[in-house]
A protein has these predicted regions:
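Active-site anion/phosphate-binding pocket segments in diverse small-molecule metabolic enzymes
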Residues: 1-92
Length: 92
């Protein structure tokens, strides 16, 4: 489970994914208001507090605002401006 949901601007669209442990992992079930669940394979050593990336790169894997825009049927500016202030932003 990660603490981001549709109240944070992460849309309730089938096909959403996040990066955890350098892998693109699918969101399972429905994105809730303040959280969503991620399918993590047993062989991936993930622990509470590990970083989950919504937009960006992690160990060679990436999800761009353009990727989400295509999935959500919108433009990349709407994706980035729609994310709430609760979503931590790290610019590298």
């Amino acid at each position: 489970m990660i603490a981001v949901g549709y109240a944070d601007g992460f849309r309730r669209v089938a096909g959403n994914a996040v990066l955890i442990g350098g892998r693109k992992l699918p969101i399972v079930g429905t994105v809730c208001m303040d959280q969503c669940m991620v399918r993590v394979p047993d062989e991936l050593p993930v622990k509470e507090g590990d970083e989950a990336v919504l937009i960006g790169r992690q160990r060679g894997a990436s999800i761009s605002a353009d990727d989400l825009a295509r999935l959500w049927g919108t433009i990349n500016y709407e994706v980035t401006s729609g994310l709430s202030a609760r979503v931590q932003r790290v610019v590298a």
